[in-house]
């Protein structure tokens, strides 16, 4: 089992009242950047790099980054820059980017070059994930949401061809046209770095991933919904002649460890002011999913799954309707002493059977000191236990068995 560490890298130096007074009471897209203090931001970026360096020391297999725009809920607006820093200051763990929002790139060749440089600088440690991005990303970059999926798939095809086909060649697509494709920066890994796709349950993306044999990582999805989505992937995989295993699936869960359950529960409340934003104020629906962004498919499996996602009380409005105790009781977040965390994770791993576990260790108002203690306990007690559980349950990862 592949164990990687993640944090959203949220900025929380603002108030709920600030959000309510913003256009449409939104913490993303229209929340003014006048609330951002670059002095605080400078400290945060450097603290996050310190934590990622310590994560390597504690034995994580991978360091995961993500990207969002026009929001304080994630400071990763230029994730590839952060990845380049990690490529130089770390030596062993994979650098997992989940992921670059392909539809907003007008020049996918430039992206292919950036990622190739990161792969070379890290000496072949890049895992390149791609995403469609939220509606906010499309609106923030003036990208027509109607063509989001088309641009995602075409940009993906162009990046892969750029990595694998000697140039020069010409590209004449619907959304991208280049007379000469011939970058000298190509990845160290052959034929190209591994591609993983994260998401929260787009059925079309699940099918597309299975067609490409790409691992799909479920981002904090409910347990029943995750199993249903795995079945959509599995049905497609069988149609393409293979049976998916744990190496085709990953799962992201917030996991915070302290010396006692009481301490962990107290500290873990800091998550509530992380990627959901201070005040947990719901994002307007037309920001998250603008007209044209969603699918028009009438496949009954897809319709049923979409309804299940919409009715998930922990998803609607970004966890705004769920009390902290409810979240813990549902095991959507795993927070406690090492023994408590190991016990609960055994249950989750037995049920979900992912070959990749993304561990969201801290965010929001969780202090740097508490974050470092969490990572220390992870390295000393939790990660060794998880490796034993992974072997016992035969949770093969993509580096043990190619997807």
Task: Report the location of each language-model feature.
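Acidic (Asp/Glu)-rich catalytic clusters
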Residues: 56-57, 83-92, 115, 119-126, ...
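Short, well-ordered coil/turn segments that N-cap beta-strands
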Residues: 1-4, 60-62, 90-95, 121-127, ...
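N-terminal beta1-alpha1-beta2 module of alpha/beta enzyme domains
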Residues: 1-90, 193, 396-403
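Alpha-helix-loop-beta-strand connector modules within alpha/beta enzyme cores
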Residues: 76-97, 378-387
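Glycine-rich, proline-tolerant flexible connector loops at the mouths of alpha/beta enzymes
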Residues: 62-85, 101-102, 220-221, 359-371
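Active-site mouth loops of central-metabolism enzymes
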Residues: 31-46, 99-109, 191-200, 255-258, ...
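An alpha-helical appendage that flanks or caps ligand/catalytic pockets
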Residues: 7-36, 149-184, 225-354, 387-403
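Conserved, mostly hydrophobic/aromatic
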Residues: 55, 67, 86, 118, ...
């Amino acid at each position: 089992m592949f164990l990687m560490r993640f944090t959203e890298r949220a900025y929380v130096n603002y108030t709920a009242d600030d959000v309510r007074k913003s256009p449409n009471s939104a913490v993303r897209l229209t929340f003014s950047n006048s609330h951002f203090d670059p002095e605080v931001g400078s400290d945060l970026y450097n603290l996050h790099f310190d934590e990622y360096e310590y994560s390597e020391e504690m034995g994580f297999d991978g360091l995961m980054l993500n990207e969002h725009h026009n929001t304080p809920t994630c400071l990763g607006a230029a994730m590839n820059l952060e990845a380049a820093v990690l490529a130089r200051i770390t030596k062993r763990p994979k650098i997992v980017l989940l992921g670059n929002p392909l539809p907003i790139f007008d020049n996918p060749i430039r992206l292919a070059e950036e990622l190739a440089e990161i792969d070379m600088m890290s000496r072949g440690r890049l895992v390149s994930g791609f995403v469609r991005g939220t509606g906010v990303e499309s609106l923030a970059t003036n990208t027509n949401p109607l063509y989001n999926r088309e641009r995602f798939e075409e940009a993906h095809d162009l990046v892969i061809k750029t990595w694998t086909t000697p140039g020069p060649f010409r590209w004449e697509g619907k959304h991208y046209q280049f007379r000469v494709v011939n970058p000298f920066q190509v990845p160290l890994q052959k034929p190209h770095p591994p591609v993983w796709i994260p998401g929260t349950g787009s059925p079309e993306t699940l099918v597309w991933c299975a067609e490409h044999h790409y691992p799909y990582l479920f981002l904090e999805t409910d347990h029943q919904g995750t199993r249903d989505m795995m079945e959509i992937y599995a049905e497609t995989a069988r149609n393409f002649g293979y049976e998916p295993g744990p190496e085709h699936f990953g799962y992201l869960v917030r996991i915070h460890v302290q010396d006692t359950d009481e301490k962990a529960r107290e500290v873990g409340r800091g998550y509530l002011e992380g990627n959901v934003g201070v005040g947990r104020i719901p994002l307007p629906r037309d920001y998250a999913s603008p007209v044209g962004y969603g699918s028009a498919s009438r496949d009954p499996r897809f319709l049923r799954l979409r309804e299940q996602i919409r009715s998930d009380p922990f998803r609607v409005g970004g966890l705004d309707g769920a009390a902290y105790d409810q979240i813990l009781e549902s095991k959507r977040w795993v927070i406690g002493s090492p023994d408590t965390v190991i016990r609960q994770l055994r249950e989750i791993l037995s049920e979900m059977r992912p070959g990749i576990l993304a561990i969201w260790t801290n965010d929001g108002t969780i202090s740097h000191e508490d974050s470092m203690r969490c990572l220390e306990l992870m390295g000393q007690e939790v990660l060794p236990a998880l490796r034993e559980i992974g072997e016992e349950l035969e949770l093969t990862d993509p580096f043990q068995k190619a997807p």
